[in-house]
């Protein structure tokens, strides 16, 4: 999803129970998401008002919260209501990437251990930029680097330092993405999935079956293409 490009409209976001202009959204400096990256996030793609893969994304959000021991503050029904409200309040975005973040919350002091806290909940909409056909045909440039991120990358943790550094390295190399590999196997890219469609085979890393990848595999299988194994580096 390409979310680049300036917006001339004022964005409305959701923060801890309130829908407010983005420029008025502030969190405490003692928030553990700010101090430690102690939280999880999820991104819901929305095209023509249709939330793509809603249930799988909500399931992954729950899995992420369970993995870091944060109680889910809302029911799925409540999350869906909030997401749809954000979409309606930001109608200037034709297609949306709905970013939802939950941190463990604010503590009284900076400490690695924690008590049960009230989570900080944030939701925003970013415009998904449409890509022209000639751009797709031309393709994008990429560099490759060894994947040295932590091994629980299926948990969508907010601490994306490694991904940020990989993306910046691509930018400084006049490339648009960094493709990552570990032990000779392609894992993913700094902010993208990686696939190769060769003849009638659909190649990707089967250990990284995230929401978008499952959706694309479903489409390919229904188009009578085969899914076959890992990409090697």
Please place each PLM-identified region on the residue numbering.
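Low-acidity, Ser/Thr- and Arg-rich intrinsically disordered low-complexity segments
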Residues: 212, 224-226, 230-232
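Intrinsic-disorder/low-complexity regions
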Residues: 1, 192, 199, 216-221, ...
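Conserved alpha/beta cores of soluble small-molecule-handling proteins
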Residues: 1-177, 182-185, 217, 223, ...
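Glycine- and Gly-Pro-enriched alpha-helical subdomains that act as flexible
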Residues: 185-207, 212
